[in-house]
């Protein structure tokens, strides 16, 4: 005796409704051999649809045994059941259950997508099946463009896509007119002659008479099993042979590509909802990139503005502290202190510093200038550079020469009209003639003075003896050597100055402390604003989760159809995860573009007040963040979709 294709022994199915248990199927014994055409007939509520769901591995029996080719279905995992549906079973539904956003070919090839068949191969087979069923020229029509009979033919082609050894037809003519119904029944009869095993579920005896065997079910029990045709069965269709095994990488890439294609179709079908979902991500990512860019711009601007402080610089000024009202009357800070400091091993360079104001003239041009007296090491201590010329030598300082270095403001004010080089030119500083030997770079910042004023540097000895007639200086700047602990050097300098002065009539100003304090404040400010932007991004992420949950609810029926044609739980989860990630990545891209374009416009309008620097690590991080958001906030909706019961999903409309 041959092994039956389908065998049920004592199968029952019950459901819990509150505290009560409802028995839908009771003690079903059924055997269907390969190549049979069976009609299961019964009135509404008789249990015939539940029986079909169990036969199609969409549902599990509560009791008894169900075997397909001797394989106990009860022992199979959800993914194994999906494989069984995918490889052996094809469904034909009363209402077709086609994907509205896919073409006829796209709908037919869905089972082959989950069977990991190559794209070109499944396209060829889908087209051939449609041609065979009289739908040549309709390959790229969407379901809405097809009649009911044509849609049912597409459904039949889908059932045959992976072989269709067993075809389960649930009221296949229920939604068709009589002519289309006859055509569909003729197709099903022909498929049975070709060896397909057919099970038709119907309430219409006229439809049931087309089968060789009629099984009547009433109140969950089989009450009649009649053979209407005793002619020999056609040779049964052999199980669909396994497709050549493809590399895992190729399978994965193909599945991702198809999931991406389906995600794009779903997004396009709900464009407004997709745009609203993206909006939260767009503005969240734009906020993060903009804030980071503005923070980076502010940081660089701050660095430029405090760059004049130099590296490891300690400044000495008269007075016990910045609040000493008598600081202006203290005359004890003298050039000899700078000489003593220069002899210390931890000191790299030293320069006295003092300033005054004067009137500078060149030919018919004149301007008020800030005059700064410095030593030969001043430009080294402050880290300042020259655009042209040279700095002072120790000999020029010792001899109190009238050599001068001007800034770029002076060059533009006095020499821009003539276009000549300032080097070697003689200027009149009040009544003293000075010769220009250098021009400071345009981006030079001068400590303690306004950058929009004109500055001129002379040897401090020249200012002391020729301009001001005094012996004390306004300050001394000290640069410690590389690798020297700046805090320890500060303490040692304080001890040396106390020994020289006998009292603490000076104060120390450690520029590195200021630099670190400014940078720390800037960093703290950036972190705080970034956190605010991240909160906005998080809120947008919750929107993604919310919309994806809504999407799962709206597309429950679609999920059921995909499961019916063989989609694994992993396939469903991957589908919705990719959709969530795609939404977030697209939103991330738009957010970055919005931030860059908006930042450029903002910087152009605000100028140097609020500069924005594009931080490519931040841009890269934004994309990674968008991807992570899609995966994290899309996981729960995707998981919910993957865990849906196929029967419940299919019954959802």
Swiss-Prot record:
One of its GO terms (biological process) is response to antibiotic. The chain crosses the membrane at residues 275-295, 525-545, 576-596, 616-636. ATP binds at residues 42-49. One of its GO terms (cellular component) is plasma membrane. Its main location: membrane. Keywords: Antibiotic resistance, ATP-binding, Cell inner membrane, Cell membrane, Membrane, Nucleotide-binding, Translocase, Transmembrane, Transmembrane helix, Transport. It is found in: Cell inner membrane. Coiled coil: none annotated. Residues 6-244 form the ABC transporter domain. Its EC number is 7.6.2.-. It is a multi-pass membrane protein. GO terms for molecular function: ATP binding; ATP hydrolysis activity; transmembrane transporter activity. It comes from the Bacteria. InterPro entries: AAA+_ATPase (IPR003593), ABC3_permease_C (IPR003838), ABC_transporter-like_ATP-bd (IPR003439), ABC_transporter-like_CS (IPR017871), MacB-like_ATP-bd (IPR017911), MacB_PCD (IPR025857), Macrolide_Exporter_MacB (IPR050250), P-loop_NTPase (IPR027417). Belongs to the ABC transporter superfamily. Macrolide exporter (TC 3.A.1.122) family. PANTHER family: MACROLIDE EXPORT ATP-BINDING_PERMEASE PROTEIN MACB (PTHR30572:SF14), MEMBRANE COMPONENT OF TRANSPORTER-RELATED (PTHR30572). Homodimer. Part of the tripartite efflux system MacAB-TolC, which is composed of an inner membrane transporter, MacB, a periplasmic membrane fusion protein, MacA, and an outer membrane component, TolC. The complex forms a large protein conduit and can translocate molecules across both the inner and outer membranes. Interacts with MacA. Part of the tripartite efflux system MacAB-TolC. MacB is a non-canonical ABC transporter that contains transmembrane domains (TMD), which form a pore in the inner membrane, and an ATP-binding domain (NBD), which is responsible for energy generation. Confers resistance against macrolides. This is Macrolide export ATP-binding/permease protein MacB. It comes from Sodalis glossinidius (strain morsitans). The lineage of its organism: Bacteria, Pseudomonadati, Pseudomonadota, Gammaproteobacteria, Enterobacterales. The gene is macB.
